[in-house]
């Protein structure tokens, strides 16, 4: 039996720790041997959880790189705009890498990281976790089998629930593009555009156009008597659907890893601790209409492919529930379904039947957290981490494996979609 690969966590945030959980559930595959993070609380937590010494705790990727190669790989879960400054020194030191998506905030940094990986012959895998869910993996298998023929059109939709949108993209880390260096489309939908590129891998994108705006969450749309902080001066605290009390105090476990991160130094924070945090300077206590958000809350993308096929992706935020929907039309049939229902349908042309078609329901029977509110993504997270081990070992990875080179098309399409949106929908040429 092969020894587990060794890994150091760089950026001990929510996503990196989810992938590192494989070392707990499957210690024969992965062993966490160190951490690099500026937060002493997180360094201490990782040291205790994974059982390594204080000598393997570092304050930054740069400090880690100065010590030479101390493990087989790193799990890079730093913020999007930190990927260049953390990835380059570690790849140059000889580490292979599991790198969170989006792996770069713009085309220039994307190409620089790709060039570094190529120069060092590094094995770099991007965390496109939705590829690993039974839903999308199952659809990919049916397309590869040729059941629906050549793809003519692919339509994807992502509805972002009101509580996810408000927590992550209005009040949270990805609300302001100047601070997080990431657009809404890149932060939320590089998943979806990657899925489109993966399912259309027999051809290449050639042109992109896009429209979108910040439509709903701005000061002029606030109720007349709304305050500035929900728990401090707002008379609507008990009735507003975006009230910090209703979203975070009444539902303290939902998105807890974002909302309560400033309380992580307290072992068991009380409700009073949480109320005081939201009353203070926490962005999660702000009126939803009076934040410093500048990202869009809806956007549509149109893609033209070399084969003549077309694709569309629609992002809409503020819905009653999260939803990912897909509909693929081929020359012999269609595949369509909703990710949250964990089932899809294969509808094939059949002129001799009464309905002139044959429809097969594929029920994957996956339950649990499908949107990541508690960390899960329909089972994709653990499968991705295990596939990374196979990738690093040089074993044959799964159909879903996304090397950094496979991820370029999806990222580039997002950058160009945003450029098109910023220029009134002007089509952009895709040069891979």
Predicted regions mapped to residue ranges:
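Beta-loop-alpha module in the N-terminal Rossmann-like domain of NAD(P)-dependent dehydrogenases
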Residues: 13, 52-116
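N-terminal Rossmann-like dinucleotide-binding module
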Residues: 1-52, 196
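Predominantly a Rossmann-like dinucleotide-binding segment in NAD(P)-dependent oxidoreductases
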Residues: 130-286, 424
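Hydrophobic residues in well-ordered beta-strands that form the structural core
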Residues: 76, 99, 105, 124-126, ...
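C-terminal helical cap and adjacent loop that interface with cofactors, partners, or active-site loops
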Residues: 50, 295-432
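Rossmann-fold dehydrogenase core element
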Residues: 112-129, 149-153
């Amino acid at each position: 039996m092969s020894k587990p690969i060794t890994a150091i966590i760089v950026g001990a945030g929510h996503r990196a720790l989810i992938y590192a959980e494989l070392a707990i559930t499957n210690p024969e595959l992965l062993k966490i041997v160190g951490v690099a993070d500026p937060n002493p609380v997180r360094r201490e937590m990782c040291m205790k959880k994974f059982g390594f010494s204080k000598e393997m705790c570092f304050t930054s990727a740069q400090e880690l790189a100065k010590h030479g190669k101390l493990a087989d790989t790193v799990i890079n879960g730093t913020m999007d705009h930190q990927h260049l400054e953390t990835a380059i020194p570690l790849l140059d030191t000889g580490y292979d890498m599991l790198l969170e998506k989006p792996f770069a905030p713009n085309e220039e940094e994307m190409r620089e990281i790709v060039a570094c990986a190529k120069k060092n012959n590094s094995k770099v895998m991007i965390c496109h976790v939705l590829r690993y869910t039974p839903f999308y993996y199952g659809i990919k298998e049916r397309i590869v089998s040729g059941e629906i023929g050549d793809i003519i059109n692919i339509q994807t939709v992502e509805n972002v629930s009101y509580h996810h949108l408000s927590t992550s993209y209005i009040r949270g880390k990805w609300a302001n593009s100047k601070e997080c260096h990431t657009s809404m489309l890149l932060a939320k939908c590089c998943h979806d555009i990657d899925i489109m590129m993966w399912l259309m891998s027999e051809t290449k994108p050639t042109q992109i156009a896009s429209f979108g705006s910040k439509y709903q969450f701005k000061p002029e749309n606030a109720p007349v008597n709304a305050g500035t902080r929900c728990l401090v001066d707002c008379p609507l605290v008990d009735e507003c659907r975006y009230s910090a009390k209703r979203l975070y105090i009444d539902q303290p476990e939902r998105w807890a890893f974002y909302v309560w991160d400033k309380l992580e130094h307290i072992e068991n924070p009380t409700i009073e601790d949480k109320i005081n945090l939201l009353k203070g300077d926490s962005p999660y206590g702000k009126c939803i209409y009076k934040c410093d958000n500048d990202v869009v809350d809806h956007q549509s993308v149109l893609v033209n492919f070399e084969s003549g096929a077309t694709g569309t992706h629609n992002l809409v935020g503020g819905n009653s529930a999260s939803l990912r929907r897909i509909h693929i039309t081929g020359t012999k049939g269609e595949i369509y379904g909703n990710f949250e229902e964990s089932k899809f349908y294969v509808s094939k042309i059949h002129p001799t039947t009464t309905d002139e078609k044959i429809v097969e329901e594929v029920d994957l029977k996956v339950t649990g957290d499908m949107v990541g509110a508690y960390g899960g993504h329909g089972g994709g997270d653990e499968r991705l981490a295990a596939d990374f081990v196979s990738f690093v070992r040089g074993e044959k990875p799964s159909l879903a494996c996304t090397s950094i080179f496979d991820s370029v098309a999806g990222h580039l399409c997002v950058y160009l979609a945003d450029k098109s949106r910023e220029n009134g929908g002007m089509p952009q040429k895709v040069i891979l």
